[in-house]
Amino acid sequence: MQEQYNPQDIEQKVQKHWDDNKTFVVSEDPNKEKFYCLSMFPYPSGRLHMGHVRNYTIGDVVSRFQRLQGKNVMQPIGWDAFGLPAENAAVKNNTAPAPWTYENIEYMKNQLKLLGFGYDWNREFATCTPEYYRWEQEFFTKLYEKGLVYKKTSSVNWCPNDQTVLANEQVEDGCCWRCDTPVEQKEIPQWFIKITEYAQELLDDLDKLEGWPEMVKTMQRNWIGRSEGVELKFEVKGQQDLEVYTTRPDTLMGVTYVGIAAGHPLATLAAENNPELAAFIEECKNTKVAEAELATMEKKGMATGLTAIHPLNGREVPVYVANFVLMDYGTGAVMAVPAHDQRDFEFATKYGLDIIPVIKPADGSELDISEAAYTEKGVLFDSGEFDGLEFQAAFDAIAAKLEAEGKGTKTVNFRLRDWGVSRQRYWGAPIPMVTTEDGEVHPVPADQLPVILPEDVVMDGVTSPIKADKEWAKTTFNGEPALRETDTFDTFMESSWYYARYCSPQADDILDPEKANYWLPVDQYIGGIEHACMHLLYSRFFHKLLRDAGYVTSDEPFKQLLCQGMVLADAFYFENEKGGKEWVAPTDVAVERDGKGRIISAKDNEGRDVTHSGMIKMSKSKNNGIDPQEMVDKYGADTVRLFMMFASPADMTLEWQESGVEGANRFLKRVWKLVKEHAEKGAAEAVDTAALSGEQKALRRDVHKTIAKVTDDIARRQTFNTAIAAIMELMNKLAKAPQESAQDRAILDEALKAVVTMLYPITPHISYELWTALGESDIDNAAWPTFDEKALVEDEKTIVVQVNGKLRAKLTVAADATKEQVEELGLNDENVTKFTDGLTIRKVIYVPGKLLNIVAN
């Protein structure tokens, strides 16, 4: 065993051992309990960042812990390799996306190996290879044949600079989130998958996900957005009926206008002879916003000149085009009740429209709508036959009347929209559909799949190469000339089923059901909460599609979900001549701190004063990322892993502090030193519990308490940082423990073996080496230490004795000593009597097993 802890030598040696022995390569074993642990796979951007390291360290800790529990553990890795960044990089570097992507994969794979993650590399794949996306294409054609896929023209957010469609969430202040170009609206035909057919099941099955954070489930519930309401018809003079959806039919008698979306057919019709309205509609279409911003944006509208007839009281109300009505929610039209909806109230106030209250507070308090709408549920008035009814009774009665008159029906609505999977990009999986000369659309037959994306292309940064190359699109269908679809799949398609492909990556089908049903569902999934509503919802949907196609038997893909927090670091900037911020890397900044460790001044390496922007998320744009490679080279992978797991609870933000990394390194050096000193004295004998002294029993109790705590912290609570803190605390006690007698050494031997095994999931390289030094072999297949219940039983207890609240003595008593025995010992202790002589004992308070307080005066 080396004198000093040298991580570089150890880590290379141990990693070679894992590779040579295929330690983490697994197969199905029906005699063993399986555990499938998965971290969200990386996009091959070129280099790992600390966010990756945190995510994958958590996954590796869970995997190795479960392995020591004797389970058959699968931990795979692969590459989410399609996407726009590769196109942007290709244009910038004058190359094609494919070579850029494959080079990045090689580099990042090496980085992952240096960090010592226990992956089954035999299962590795990249989603940009035809061997992967071929099955996705075939599954898509099967969904088409089942009627779950359709094509329709839809208005999309179009970035003219990137030449691509953006999701609502990718539009920030009317501009593209990537390049800040003003976003336009464009009508284009797109492919959709009917996720709405599964909306109710996706909602209901959230209740089965007991191992998911409540916050993520709430986000998905809101995203799916189930509501119960009424779909009703307003007649429009000289036009077809206008259908609206409302969740508040109780307010129907307060309708004073109807709002329609700019994309509504009625709006288009009304604008035909109204240039002003046509211009307003165009403006609305080009300022599409994320739904989250609707509440705060300025409400704008314009009268169409059309009049709608109230379905129950026959009142005529104007029809307005309004910028807050969304075409893709409900029917694209809303009944407006300004007295009882804040958005309608603001609009009516702005345009001088009637505000008619019809709901008053149920508690009899006064109704006040002078400043804002009254939006609570209450009692109806000025509503004819429905006066006096409260919400549910009014809902049912008004819905029944509308149904009886053929003017409405009760209905359930979902906020969730069908999944638009078309992207006008090159670097994605081609959509396997063709159009023949008669305009008919057909899926590509299975024997002609995959439709291969050509990789040897020239990127001009504007048009997708497969759109520019007219020859690529030419094909045949049943001997007839046909044109290929030149859109590619949304990259969420690949990430929606990758977890399942890992179960049988070489299968000659999308999945091998036998293998998939052995491994699935994933027992532990780890990734960022930013994926709550897209990736995690699409994966749940895809799993149900796979189930209904007979590939899997489970309903849900991920049993337990851990969303790791972001990694933060200090960020510094100075203002340039134009007033813009120039961000300076923290490694190039010298700081001065006050007594509390707060930064009071900072200068960059050119001597310039820089401003400390605080601890913020590590990112390229803020130049505050720390390269994991540098840290591994400097301290070793185990130190980086230990810091990542210790510095913060896994689901909270982690503040990067190099002083903390140094502290983690010092701790590992202490463990190394103690094991080395112990091992050099030769083998220790077994613990003889009958021969232990009180002090030895107390130390052994600490060892087994620590084992119990660490086991619970990792397995149940997933508070890895507190588990590490408990191990550190135990190490402090072991370092001070006597090592004179044979039983002293026996306890230390048992304790060090427990410490090394408990550290193994977190710091596997040093643990491998120390395990060998302790005379054991093959820690990768060792058993997790079990705590001895008997060791936790105390023979004696220490009782603190206070006189008038001040500590005066400590008693060692038998664990089963009675209150009377403790009182007698306490009152007669010579140090206690010094402070009670001549006083009257007024009261004796005993807290069993802990404290004796004597009150005297």
Curated annotation (Swiss-Prot):
Q: Where in the cell is it found?
A: Cytoplasm
Keyword line: Aminoacyl-tRNA synthetase, ATP-binding, Cytoplasm, Ligase, Nucleotide-binding, Protein biosynthesis
Q: What is its EC number?
A: 6.1.1.4
Q: Gene3D superfamilies per the record?
A: 2.20.28.290, 3.10.20.590, HUPs (3.40.50.620), Isoleucyl-tRNA Synthetase, Domain 1 (1.10.730.10), Valyl/Leucyl/Isoleucyl-tRNA synthetase, editing domain (3.90.740.10)
GO BP annotations, alphabetical order: leucyl-tRNA aminoacylation
* Residue ranges that the Swiss-Prot or TrEMBL entry lists as coiled coil: none
**Keyword Nucleotide-binding in annotation:** yes
Known catalytic reactions: tRNA(Leu) + L-leucine + ATP = L-leucyl-tRNA(Leu) + AMP + diphosphate
Record motif 'KMSKS' region, residues: 617-621
For molecular function, the Gene Ontology terms on record are: aminoacyl-tRNA deacylase activity; ATP binding; leucine-tRNA ligase activity
Q: Which cysteines are joined by disulfide bonds?
A: none
Where does the protein principally reside? Answer: cytoplasm
Q: Where does ATP bind?
A: K620
**CDD domains assigned to the protein according to its UniProt record, in alphabetical order:** Anticodon_Ia_Leu_BEm (cd07958), LeuRS_core (cd00812)
Task: Please tell me one Gene Ontology term that the record gives under cellular component.
Answer: cytosol
Positions occupied by motif 'HIGH' region: 42-52
Which enzyme class, named as a word? ligase
The family database entries (InterPro entries) matched by this protein are listed as: aa-tRNA-synth_I_CS (IPR001412), aa-tRNA-synth_Ia (IPR002300), Leu-tRNA-ligase (IPR002302), Leu_tRNA-synth_edit (IPR025709), M/V/L/I-tRNA-synth_anticd-bd (IPR013155), Methionyl/Leucyl_tRNA_Synth (IPR015413), Rossmann-like_a/b/a_fold (IPR014729), tRNAsynth_Ia_anticodon-bd (IPR009080)
- Family per UniProt? Belongs to the class-I aminoacyl-tRNA synthetase family.
Q: Which HAMAP family match?
A: Leu_tRNA_synth_B (MF_00049_B)
List the protein's name.
Leucine--tRNA ligase
Q: What is the lineage of its organism?
A: Bacteria, Pseudomonadati, Pseudomonadota, Gammaproteobacteria, Vibrionales
